[in-house]
Regions:
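Histidine/lysine/aspartate-rich catalytic loop segments that bind and position anionic ligands
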Residues: 128-144
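Conserved non-catalytic scaffold segment of RNase H-like nuclease domains
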Residues: 2-132
């Protein structure tokens, strides 16, 4: 049985409409986990048939970091001035995705940025490679 068959068979017994997956995406001020910040984080939960159930999204204030790559994601400094910080939404975000199988496109990037924000928030440098057990959609596409 292939990777996709295992994945689908693992979750299809669930009731349609019950969220079991969460697809996560972040937008950042850049690519360096030590200096750059997440300025948008979003998740869509889906049922076992990959039908969207609900979504969660917020812009984030990057604590004084200037957004220099607005041309990529369209998020400007003005848009995040009054947005909450990562630490202010962390509980809501983790509650929303709790118990979900997580997906992300280029998951290692999103994961390292979430880890970096969490480390800044807690004051602990975990330096772990994983935040949650993400399935990377880039790797998933290679299985097809």
């Amino acid at each position: 049985m292939g990777f996709l068959e295992n994945l689908f068979n693992r979750y299809t017994p669930r009731t349609p409409g019950e969220p079991v997956f969460a697809v996560i995406d972040t937008e950042t001020t850049g690519f360096n986990k030590r200096y750059d910040r997440i300025i948008e984080i979003a998740a869509v939960r889906a049922d076992s048939h990959f039908n969207p159930v609900d979504s969660w999204h917020t812009l984030l204030n990057p604590d004084g970091k200037t957004i220099k790559n607005s041309h990529i994601h369209g998020i400007t400094n003005d848009m995040v001035t009054t947005a909450p910080t990562f630490s202010e939404v962390y509980g809501d975000f983790t509650s929303y995705i709790d118990g979900m199988q997580l997906f992300a496109h280029n998951a290692p990037f999103d994961s390292k940025m979430i880890i970096a924000e969490t480390d800044r928030m807690t004051g602990v440098d975990d330096d772990e490679d994983e935040f949650f057990p993400f399935i990377d959609t880039i790797d998933l596409a290679k299985q097809i």
